[in-house]
């Protein structure tokens, strides 16, 4: 029950991060075609776009994916990637998705993430899903 749904742009930073996690995952298509349908609980991993503000911070394919009510009903948490050069807007896509979907903002990491980030996310996801499955 530890599904990751993620979006990665042509830079492939988020894709490489998710691959290093070694967890079951589904990728939101880059073209935003909306072809991905999820039928089980998931945590979304997304990059943050834009030059430091909240406008345009969530990638459009992620917005389209979450605008599908069925997909949105299965989101359980969010992890965001970003660039710390953007200061207070670092990983702001996570804040936006967390607030709009009313799910916890679980973690944030810079660019490709570090080995420490990978370990933190793996351990955190295990604890998170264990808590989710308790009665």
UniProtKB/Swiss-Prot annotation:
GO molecular function: FMN binding
InterPro entries according to UniProt: Flavoprotein-like_sf, RNR_Ib_NrdI_bac, RNR_NrdI
SUPFAM superfamilies: Flavoproteins
Function recorded in the entry: Probably involved in ribonucleotide reductase function.
Family to which this protein belongs: Belongs to the NrdI family.
Protein name per Swiss-Prot or TrEMBL: Protein NrdI
GO-annotated biological processes: protein modification process
Organism superkingdom: Bacteria
NCBIfam families (UniProt xref): nrdI
Taxonomic source organism: Brucella anthropi (strain ATCC 49188 / DSM 6882 / CCUG 24695 / JCM 21032 / LMG 3331 / NBRC 15819 / NCTC 12168 / Alc 37) (Ochrobactrum anthropi)
């Amino acid at each position: 029950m530890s599904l990751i749904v993620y979006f990665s742009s042509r830079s492939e930073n988020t894709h490489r991060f998710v691959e290093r996690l070694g967890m079951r995952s589904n990728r939101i298509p880059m073209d935003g075609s909306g072809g991905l349908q999820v039928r089980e609980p998931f945590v979304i991993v997304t990059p943050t776009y834009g030059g430091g503000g909240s406008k345009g911070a969530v990638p459009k394919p992620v917005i389209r994916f979450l605008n599908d009510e069925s997909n949105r009903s299965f989101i359980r948490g969010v992890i965001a990637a970003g660039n710390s050069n953007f200061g207070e807007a670092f990983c702001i896509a996570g804040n936006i998705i967390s607030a709009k979907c009313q799910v916890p903002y679980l973690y944030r990491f810079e660019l490709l993430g570090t080995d420490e980030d990978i370990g933190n996310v793996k351990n955190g996801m295990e604890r998170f899903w264990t808590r989710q499955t308790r009665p």
